[in-house]
Each structure stands twice: as structure tokens, then as C-alpha cells.
Amino acid sequence: MSMKIKICIPTERIQNPIISETIVETGILLNIMVANIDSTYGELIADVKDSRFARIKKALESRGAIVAILDRPIHRDEEECVECGACISVCPMNVYSFDETWSLCVDEKKCIQCGMCIKMCPHGALKLGE
């Protein structure tokens, strides 16, 4: 099994090749799903095998990164949701779709907790981890 993790690289460490060094040192491959990195901060969402999490976390943290397990999927308030589809257009992982009756479907297992859908939802019907 694999798990999704969030890796945050603070400003003072952003110029260092933290991810590359960690992969070379540990031999553990990361499947990077989303990466937002600029000159001041870095944030990545990645998949790593459950059995290798502790080792990769230790190696990343020794380089100044902050690592967290993403285990709380998106929650949709069905009473607040008007099924407008705004979430479909911004989700990078295709968590949202319409079925054959045009009802909104949510595949929580695909969610990487990037928050794009939450920002886009005009009714505030989406939240993380509730």
C-alpha cells in the first residue's frame, strides 16, 4: 500500500536539492503528484509506500523539511452542494465527476488535499478532513 504525504520546504532550505538528496540517499522513489515551489517556499504532495514512510520522513526532516501524512479526504456537504461542477474543472486528480444522471460523484481515494476545489466552490460545500 502507499500513502499520500505532504512535504513542506521552508524558505531557508528552498535553495537546497532536498528531494533529490533524499531519493539518492535512501533509494526510495517518490511519486510526486503536485509540486508548488518558488524562491520562498516549497510544497509537494507525493505517494510513498507505507513500509518506507518512516525512513523517507527521517531523511527529509534531517534536511529541514516538514512531512505530514495526508489521511483526511475531502468532505462534501450534500445539503450545501448545488452540483454546479466548479470542483470538476479545477481538480488535478479527477476526484469529481458527473454520473449518467448528472449527479456529482466524489472519489475520495484520489484526493491529494490540494484545496483547489475548496477555493473554487461557490457555496462552501467542500472541506478537508471532516
From Swiss-Prot:
> Which GO terms are recorded in the biological process aspect for this UniProt protein?
methionine biosynthetic process
UniProt key word 4Fe-4S = yes
One Pfam family here: NIL
Gene3D superfamilies on file:
3.30.70.20
Q: How is the cofactor bound?
A: Binds 2 [4Fe-4S] cluster.
Q: Tell me which UniProt keywords the record has, alphabetically.
A: 4Fe-4S, Amino-acid biosynthesis, Electron transport, Iron, Iron-sulfur, Metal-binding, Methionine biosynthesis, Repeat, Transport
Q: Electron transport as a keyword? A: yes
Which cofactors are required for activity?
Answer: [4Fe-4S] cluster
* Residues binding [4Fe-4S] cluster 2: 91, 111, 114, 117
Query: Where do the 4Fe-4S ferredoxin-type domain residues begin and end?
Result: 72-101, 102-130
One annotated GO molecular function:
4 iron, 4 sulfur cluster binding
Protein's pathway: Amino-acid biosynthesis
Q: Where does [4Fe-4S] cluster 1 bind?
A: 81, 84, 87, 121
Function (record text): Required for O-acetylhomoserine sulfhydrylase (OAHS)-independent homocysteine (Hcy) biosynthesis. Together with MA_1821, catalyzes the condensation of sulfide with aspartate semialdehyde to generate homocysteine. May be involved in the reduction of the disulfide formed in MA_1821.
Q: How does it assemble?
A: May form a complex with MA_1821.
* PANTHER family xrefs: ADENYLYLSULFATE REDUCTASE, BETA SUBUNIT, L-ASPARTATE SEMIALDEHYDE SULFURTRANSFERASE IRON-SULFUR SUBUNIT
Q: Spell out the protein name for this chain.
A: L-aspartate semialdehyde sulfurtransferase iron-sulfur subunit
